UniProtKB/Swiss-Prot annotation:
Family membership: Belongs to the G-protein coupled receptor 1 family.
Compartment(s) of residence: Cell membrane
Organism of this sequence: Rattus norvegicus (Rat)
GO molecular function list: G protein-coupled receptor activity; receptor serine/threonine kinase binding
Keyword tRNA processing: no
Regulation: induction: In brain areas affected by ischemia.
Keyword entries, A-Z: Cell membrane, Disulfide bond, G-protein coupled receptor, Glycoprotein, Membrane, Receptor, Transducer, Transmembrane, Transmembrane helix
InterPro entries hit by this protein: GPCR_Rhodpsn (IPR000276), GPCR_Rhodpsn_7TM (IPR017452)
Extracellular side stretches: 1-36, 86-105, 169-195, 254-280
Miscellaneous comment as given in the Swiss-Prot or TrEMBL entry: Administration of an antisense oligonucleotide specific for GPR17 significantly reduced brain damage following ischemia.
Protein name: Uracil nucleotide/cysteinyl leukotriene receptor
Disulfide bonds: C104-C181
Major location (coarse): membrane
Length: 339
């Protein structure tokens, strides 16, 4: 993960950074566009995840592993959203970081902590769906809310420890009378980052894709599974994979290219500018995850959609709310954990 690749910048690094900053400097138009994007993203993600977290806590009696993972995902998204205003100020200030060293470290720490926590919670949701649909009987003892909470606590600790170097190493550099926070698009480019990327992203991404491929195979071979459960599973697969492909895959692919070529001796100024712009755009896409997850909750989770409609419409919907416990046929044993 990016925290593992952070090191103390040397004088040579600062000289290289100054040159790179001149090549990769944002234009006034780019600053305006990025600021508008982060403002809209902040509003949508904050409202969506705050509402989602409130609904998940309010509906805690459901007591399912899926709800536990979704609740922690909402916490991660909400925490990540809270650092977006610093990026707003950065772009409105013309690429200047006015907050100092400690806030820069905290911004980078919280951004990467919650981004990778979100990735792993999405992977946990995929694994839970796999167990519920493919092994509904065998997984009943394993899929308990307590175990889900323990898994989430373990993931929070592991990711926090991996990101901890961001809190203890200098992250600001002054170039041309402008203070630069290295955690805003200028992360240290190190070849050690490639191994970090493989551990932090490749493993959960492959796990998620594998789980959903096995789910699809099980759905195609399981004619007794009710049609609406099949449709719900397909929607879940499509939404989670879309979030991965839109928010995380572009960033990590570009990050690999960025690590290999940015600030390299043979990299031209125009190439550095293209890499820097790509880094900013893909970083924007990662923050979009906070706005897309509530959309996933709405289209995939019936109880979330029902509660949200009740809240917004101020009236009860006709018909009974979706039940996690109301299925009786063999194929619906996984209904206890339905979203």
């Amino acid at each position: 993960m990016d925290g593992l690749e952070t090191a103390l910048p040397s004088l040579t690094d600062n000289a290289s950074l100054a040159y790179s900053e001149q090549c990769g400097q944002e234009t006034p138009l780019e600053n305006m566009l990025f600021a508008c994007f982060y403002l809209l993203d902040f509003i949508l993600a904050f409202v969506g995840n705050a509402l989602a977290l409130w609904l998940f806590i309010w509906d805690h009696k459901s007591g399912t592993p899926a709800n536990v993972f979704l609740m922690h995902l909402a916490v991660a998204d909400l925490s990540c959203v809270l650092v977006l205003p610093t990026r707003l100020v950065y772009h409105f200030s013309g690429n200047h970081w006015p907050f100092g060293e400690i806030p820069c470290r905290l911004t980078g720490f919280l951004f990467y902590l919650n981004m990778y926590a979100s990735i792993y919670f999405l992977t946990c949701i995929s694994a839970d769906r796999f167990l519920a649909i493919v092994h509904p009987v065998k997984s009943l003892k394993l899929r308990r809310p307590l175990y889900a909470h323990l898994a989430c606590a373990f993931l929070w600790i592991v990711v926090a420890v991996a990101m901890a170097p961001l809190l203890v190493s200098p992250q600001t550099v002054q170039t041309n009378h402008t203070v630069v926070c290295l955690q805003l698009y200028r992360e240290k480019a190190s070849h050690h980052a490639l191994a970090s990327l493989a551990v932090a992203f490749t493993f959960p991404f492959i796990t998620t894709v594998t789980c959903y491929l096995l789910i699809i195979r099980s759905l195609r071979q399981g004619p007794r599974i009710e049609k609406h459960l099949k449709n719900k599973a397909v929607r879940m697969i499509a939404m989670v994979l879309a979030i991965f492909l839109i928010c995380f895959v572009p960033y990590h692919i570009h990050r690999s290219v960025y690590v290999l070529h940015y600030r390299g001796g043979g990299t031209s100024c125009s190439a550095q500018r293209a890499l820097a712009l790509g880094n900013r755009i893909t970083s924007c896409l990662t923050s979009l995850n906070g706005a897309l997850d509530p959309v996933m909750y709405f289209f995939v989770a019936e109880k979330f959609r029902h509660a949200l409609c009740n809240l917004l419409c101020s009236k009860r919907l006709t018909g009974p709310p979706p039940s996690f416990e109301g299925k009786t046929n063999e194929s619906s044993l996984s209904a206890r954990s339905e979203l």
